[in-house]
Protein backbone atom coordinates (compact mmCIF):
# COMPACT_ATOMS: atom_id res chain seq x y z
CA UNK A 1 0.00 0.00 0.00
CA UNK A 2 1.11 3.58 -0.49
CA UNK A 3 1.31 6.47 1.93
CA UNK A 4 -0.99 9.50 1.64
CA UNK A 5 0.61 11.14 -1.34
CA UNK A 6 -1.13 13.40 -3.82
CA UNK A 7 -3.03 15.12 -1.08
CA UNK A 8 -3.74 18.06 -3.36
CA UNK A 9 -6.32 16.19 -5.42
CA UNK A 10 -8.12 14.97 -2.34
CA UNK A 11 -8.34 18.44 -0.86
CA UNK A 12 -10.06 19.95 -3.83
CA UNK A 13 -13.53 19.29 -5.00
CA UNK A 14 -13.32 16.79 -7.83
CA UNK A 15 -15.96 18.52 -9.96
CA UNK A 16 -14.18 21.87 -9.76
CA UNK A 17 -10.84 20.31 -10.58
CA UNK A 18 -12.28 18.53 -13.57
CA UNK A 19 -14.02 21.67 -14.73
CA UNK A 20 -10.64 23.41 -14.62
CA UNK A 21 -9.23 20.85 -17.01
CA UNK A 22 -12.33 21.06 -19.17
CA UNK A 23 -12.20 24.83 -19.27
CA UNK A 24 -8.54 24.73 -20.25
CA UNK A 25 -9.11 22.44 -23.20
CA UNK A 26 -12.51 23.78 -24.21
CA UNK A 27 -11.07 27.31 -24.21
CA UNK A 28 -9.38 26.68 -27.55
CA UNK A 29 -12.56 25.26 -29.03
CA UNK A 30 -14.57 28.22 -27.75
CA UNK A 31 -12.18 30.69 -29.36
CA UNK A 32 -12.40 28.77 -32.64
CA UNK A 33 -16.16 29.15 -32.82
CA UNK A 34 -15.90 32.79 -31.79
CA UNK A 35 -17.87 32.49 -28.58
CA UNK A 36 -16.62 34.71 -25.79
CA UNK A 37 -18.48 33.24 -22.86
CA UNK A 38 -19.78 29.75 -22.33
CA UNK A 39 -21.89 28.47 -19.48
CA UNK A 40 -20.50 25.63 -17.39
CA UNK A 41 -22.76 23.08 -19.03
CA UNK A 42 -21.75 24.23 -22.48
CA UNK A 43 -18.11 23.93 -21.54
CA UNK A 44 -18.64 20.38 -20.44
CA UNK A 45 -20.58 19.53 -23.60
CA UNK A 46 -17.69 20.82 -25.68
CA UNK A 47 -15.32 18.78 -23.59
CA UNK A 48 -17.20 15.61 -24.31
CA UNK A 49 -17.12 16.38 -28.02
CA UNK A 50 -13.33 16.53 -28.05
CA UNK A 51 -11.99 13.23 -29.38
CA UNK A 52 -9.82 10.88 -27.37
CA UNK A 53 -9.92 12.89 -24.18
CA UNK A 54 -11.89 10.51 -22.07
CA UNK A 55 -13.40 7.16 -22.86
CA UNK A 56 -16.97 6.40 -21.93
CA UNK A 57 -17.28 4.57 -18.63
CA UNK A 58 -19.85 2.03 -17.70
CA UNK A 59 -20.65 1.64 -14.00
CA UNK A 60 -19.31 -1.66 -12.71
CA UNK A 61 -17.23 -2.38 -15.82
CA UNK A 62 -13.95 -4.21 -15.19
CA UNK A 63 -10.72 -4.38 -17.18
CA UNK A 64 -10.03 -8.06 -16.39
CA UNK A 65 -12.58 -10.65 -17.37
CA UNK A 66 -14.08 -12.39 -14.34
CA UNK A 67 -13.00 -9.72 -11.86
CA UNK A 68 -15.59 -8.61 -9.35
CA UNK A 69 -16.09 -4.83 -9.16
CA UNK A 70 -15.99 -3.07 -5.79
CA UNK A 71 -15.42 0.67 -6.14
CA UNK A 72 -12.66 2.30 -4.10
CA UNK A 73 -13.33 5.71 -2.57
CA UNK A 74 -12.82 8.49 -5.13
CA UNK A 75 -10.36 10.06 -2.68
CA UNK A 76 -8.02 7.09 -3.18
CA UNK A 77 -7.35 7.53 -6.87
CA UNK A 78 -7.24 10.24 -9.50
CA UNK A 79 -9.36 10.10 -12.60
CA UNK A 80 -7.25 9.94 -15.73
CA UNK A 81 -7.37 8.62 -19.27
CA UNK A 82 -4.50 6.18 -19.37
CA UNK A 83 -2.67 5.22 -21.46
CA UNK A 84 -3.38 8.39 -23.49
CA UNK A 85 -2.35 10.83 -20.76
CA UNK A 86 0.12 8.56 -18.93
CA UNK A 87 1.75 5.59 -20.67
CA UNK A 88 1.52 2.42 -18.57
CA UNK A 89 4.75 0.40 -18.38
CA UNK A 90 4.83 -1.20 -14.93
CA UNK A 91 2.86 -3.65 -12.84
CA UNK A 92 3.49 -3.19 -9.11
CA UNK A 93 3.03 -6.22 -6.85
CA UNK A 94 1.86 -5.62 -3.26
CA UNK A 95 0.92 -7.61 -0.19
CA UNK A 96 -1.87 -6.26 2.00
CA UNK A 97 -0.50 -7.16 5.47
CA UNK A 98 -4.00 -8.21 6.42
CA UNK A 99 -7.11 -9.95 5.22
CA UNK A 100 -9.04 -9.31 2.03
CA UNK A 101 -12.03 -7.70 3.73
CA UNK A 102 -9.97 -5.26 5.77
CA UNK A 103 -7.95 -4.23 2.69
CA UNK A 104 -11.13 -3.57 0.71
CA UNK A 105 -12.46 -1.54 3.63
CA UNK A 106 -9.31 0.60 3.66
CA UNK A 107 -9.59 1.22 -0.09
CA UNK A 108 -13.20 2.32 0.36
CA UNK A 109 -12.29 4.72 3.17
CA UNK A 110 -11.50 8.25 1.89
CA UNK A 111 -9.30 9.02 4.90
CA UNK A 112 -6.64 6.47 3.90
CA UNK A 113 -5.83 7.81 0.43
CA UNK A 114 -4.64 4.42 -0.75
CA UNK A 115 -6.06 1.95 -3.21
CA UNK A 116 -4.74 -0.51 -5.74
CA UNK A 117 -6.42 -1.32 -9.04
CA UNK A 118 -6.85 -4.95 -8.04
CA UNK A 119 -6.72 -7.24 -5.06
CA UNK A 120 -6.24 -11.00 -5.39
CA UNK A 121 -7.65 -13.15 -2.61
CA UNK A 122 -6.05 -16.33 -1.20
CA UNK A 123 -8.54 -18.41 -3.19
CA UNK A 124 -7.61 -16.65 -6.44
CA UNK A 125 -10.66 -14.42 -6.61
CA UNK A 126 -9.78 -11.13 -8.33
CA UNK A 127 -11.51 -7.88 -7.32
CA UNK A 128 -11.05 -4.63 -9.21
CA UNK A 129 -11.43 -1.39 -7.25
CA UNK A 130 -10.04 1.26 -9.61
CA UNK A 131 -10.24 1.31 -13.42
CA UNK A 132 -6.89 1.00 -15.19
CA UNK A 133 -7.78 4.31 -16.88
CA UNK A 134 -7.26 5.96 -13.50
CA UNK A 135 -4.22 6.62 -11.31
CA UNK A 136 -4.58 4.62 -8.08
CA UNK A 137 -2.56 5.68 -5.04
CA UNK A 138 -0.67 2.49 -4.29
CA UNK A 139 3.03 2.99 -4.94
CA UNK A 140 3.76 5.98 -2.69
CA UNK A 141 5.43 7.69 -5.66
CA UNK A 142 3.54 9.96 -7.99
CA UNK A 143 5.20 9.03 -11.27
CA UNK A 144 5.06 5.31 -10.44
CA UNK A 145 1.38 5.64 -9.62
CA UNK A 146 0.84 7.32 -12.98
CA UNK A 147 2.75 4.70 -14.96
CA UNK A 148 1.63 1.51 -13.23
CA UNK A 149 -1.18 -0.86 -12.45
CA UNK A 150 -1.14 -1.97 -8.81
CA UNK A 151 -2.09 -5.47 -7.69
CA UNK A 152 -2.54 -6.25 -4.00
CA UNK A 153 -2.38 -9.79 -2.64
CA UNK A 154 -4.14 -10.86 0.52
CA UNK A 155 -1.67 -11.96 3.17
CA UNK A 156 1.46 -11.11 5.08
CA UNK A 157 4.98 -10.44 3.84
CA UNK A 158 6.47 -12.60 6.60
CA UNK A 159 4.10 -15.55 6.09
CA UNK A 160 5.03 -17.77 3.15
CA UNK A 161 1.74 -19.66 3.43
CA UNK A 162 -0.15 -16.49 2.40
CA UNK A 163 0.80 -17.05 -1.20
CA UNK A 164 -1.36 -19.90 -2.46
CA UNK A 165 -1.24 -21.73 -5.80
CA UNK A 166 -4.63 -20.25 -6.69
CA UNK A 167 -3.37 -16.75 -5.89
CA UNK A 168 -0.23 -17.10 -8.01
CA UNK A 169 -2.18 -18.54 -10.93
CA UNK A 170 -4.90 -15.88 -10.91
CA UNK A 171 -2.51 -12.98 -10.37
CA UNK A 172 -0.20 -14.22 -13.12
CA UNK A 173 -3.13 -14.31 -15.57
CA UNK A 174 -4.01 -10.77 -14.52
CA UNK A 175 -0.44 -9.53 -14.98
CA UNK A 176 -0.26 -11.28 -18.38
CA UNK A 177 -3.42 -9.47 -19.48
CA UNK A 178 -2.11 -6.09 -18.28
CA UNK A 179 1.24 -6.58 -20.01
CA UNK A 180 -0.52 -7.58 -23.23
CA UNK A 181 -2.84 -4.56 -23.07
CA UNK A 182 0.00 -2.03 -22.82
CA UNK A 183 2.60 -3.91 -24.89
CA UNK A 184 4.90 -4.59 -21.93
CA UNK A 185 7.30 -7.52 -21.81
CA UNK A 186 6.60 -9.93 -18.95
CA UNK A 187 9.86 -9.53 -17.07
CA UNK A 188 11.29 -8.21 -13.82
CA UNK A 189 11.97 -4.81 -15.31
CA UNK A 190 8.26 -4.26 -15.96
CA UNK A 191 6.73 -6.38 -13.20
CA UNK A 192 8.15 -5.08 -9.95
CA UNK A 193 7.54 -5.25 -6.22
CA UNK A 194 6.46 -2.26 -4.17
CA UNK A 195 9.86 -2.60 -2.49
CA UNK A 196 11.47 -1.66 -5.83
CA UNK A 197 9.60 1.63 -6.24
CA UNK A 198 12.10 4.46 -5.78
CA UNK A 199 11.90 6.14 -2.40
CA UNK A 200 9.60 3.60 -0.78
CA UNK A 201 9.99 2.28 2.74
CA UNK A 202 7.65 -0.63 2.01
CA UNK A 203 9.05 -4.15 1.80
CA UNK A 204 6.22 -5.97 0.03
CA UNK A 205 5.88 -8.48 -1.48
CA UNK A 206 8.84 -9.67 0.63
CA UNK A 207 11.24 -12.64 0.51
CA UNK A 208 8.56 -15.35 0.36
CA UNK A 209 7.11 -14.07 -2.90
CA UNK A 210 8.42 -16.46 -5.57
CA UNK A 211 9.33 -14.16 -8.45
CA UNK A 212 10.68 -16.92 -10.72
CA UNK A 213 7.48 -18.85 -10.35
CA UNK A 214 5.29 -15.77 -10.78
CA UNK A 215 7.01 -14.42 -13.88
CA UNK A 216 7.10 -17.95 -15.36
CA UNK A 217 3.36 -18.35 -14.84
CA UNK A 218 2.67 -14.89 -16.27
CA UNK A 219 4.82 -15.61 -19.34
CA UNK A 220 3.00 -18.87 -19.98
CA UNK A 221 -0.35 -17.12 -19.53
CA UNK A 222 0.77 -14.45 -22.00
CA UNK A 223 1.84 -17.07 -24.54
CA UNK A 224 -1.44 -18.94 -24.27
CA UNK A 225 -3.30 -15.63 -24.73
CA UNK A 226 -1.39 -15.06 -27.95
CA UNK A 227 -2.30 -18.52 -29.28
CA UNK A 228 -6.04 -17.82 -28.91
ZN1 LIG B 1 2.58 -2.16 -1.19
Describe each PLM feature range.
Residues 85, 110, 139-143, 159-170:
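Extracytoplasmic/periplasmic, Sec-exported soluble proteins
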Residues 86-87, 146, 186:
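Structured loop/turn residues at beta-strand edges in well-structured enzyme cores
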Residues 95, 153, 195:
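Residues immediately flanking
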Residues 142-153:
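Short coil-to-beta-strand
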Residues 2-19, 26, 39-71, 157-228:
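Basic/polar, cationic surfaces and motifs that engage anionic cell-wall
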Residues 2-140:
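N-terminal catalytic cores of peptidoglycan-degrading enzymes
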Residues 136, 153-158:
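Metal-dependent polysaccharide deacetylase catalytic core of the NodB/CE4 family, i.e.
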